[in-house]
């Protein structure tokens, strides 16, 4: 049981939420962090100068862990990089402004993974849900990382990816030349090239609403894959486009099939 864990070292976790006009969903995100059993947490909300009431919700929230920064940005990865620069926790991760944690033990599970000093990063499973959170649509089941996995179309779910700040300082921030795949490129750079030792937590940690930028259209999906191919080449990772796409399609079909099964149980 998480409640029975005694941490040898209390580790501060910085959770970064990037927002822009998120009035319909950000309350769930703020509440998800505030309800966590693990409390050594900093919640950074990096807002892009929202105009719809988002700022009022954040400012009125009772959680003292929240730090709000609101100013125009150059896009989501610019905002994420601002969060990385401001984070004071030893461990850093992201929770999107329309996503939320699966339960109150998520950050405790993450803190527990980092009790092992050999662990530099961790990631877990994620489910996609409908806008009203009434049903699971897709189950993103991950696995332990093996070198070469990114060339096969594999990638951890970025909202479940937490990493030591010392690793970020060593290996760098999001590359903003990528418009849809900077998160994939960062994890690729860390795991494939940076020899970051990552622990896989075999639990669903995040519930993600459908409708993210990458999944909004086939055009964006194609563009993201093109950017991933660019990232693979840039990072010197050999790959076959056909093998990459075949593996990715099979993986996605399986994820939707499992999501369908979970929906009916």
Predicted feature locations:
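Conserved short acidic donor-positioning loop in nucleotide-sugar-dependent glycosyltransferases
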Residues: 21, 33, 48-49, 53, ...
């Amino acid at each position: 049981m998480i409640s029975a864990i005694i941490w040898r070292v209390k580790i501060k976790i910085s959770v970064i939420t990037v927002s822009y006009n998120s009035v319909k969903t950000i309350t769930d995100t703020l509440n998800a962090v505030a309800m966590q059993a693990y409390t050594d947490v900093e919640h950074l909300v990096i807002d892009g100068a929202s105009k719809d009431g988002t700022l009022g919700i954040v400012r009125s929230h009772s959680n003292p862990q929240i730090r709000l920064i609101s100013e125009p940005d150059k896009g989501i990865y610019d905002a994420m990089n601002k969060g990385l620069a401001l984070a004071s926790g030893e461990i850093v991760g992201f929770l999107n402004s329309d996503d939320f944690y699966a339960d109150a033990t998520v950050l405790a599970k993450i803190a527990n993974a980092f009790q092992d000093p050999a662990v530099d990063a961790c990631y877990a499973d994620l489910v996609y849900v409908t806008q009203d959170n009434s049903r699971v649509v897709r189950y993103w089941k991950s696995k332990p990382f093996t070198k070469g996995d990114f060339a096969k179309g594999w990638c951890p779910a970025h909202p479940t990816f937490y990493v030591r700040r010392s690793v970020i300082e060593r290996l760098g921030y999001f590359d903003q030349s990528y418009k849809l795949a900077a998160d994939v490129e960062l994890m690729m750079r860390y795991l494939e090239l940076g020899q970051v030792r990552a622990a896989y937590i075999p639990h669903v940690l995040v519930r993600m609403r459908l409708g993210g930028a990458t999944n909004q259209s086939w055009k964006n999906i194609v563009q993201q894959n093109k950017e991933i191919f660019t990232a693979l080449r840039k990072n010197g990772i050999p790959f076959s486009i056909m093998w990459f796409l075949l593996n990715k399609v099979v993986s996605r079909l399986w994820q939707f099939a499992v999501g369908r099964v979970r929906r009916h149980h």
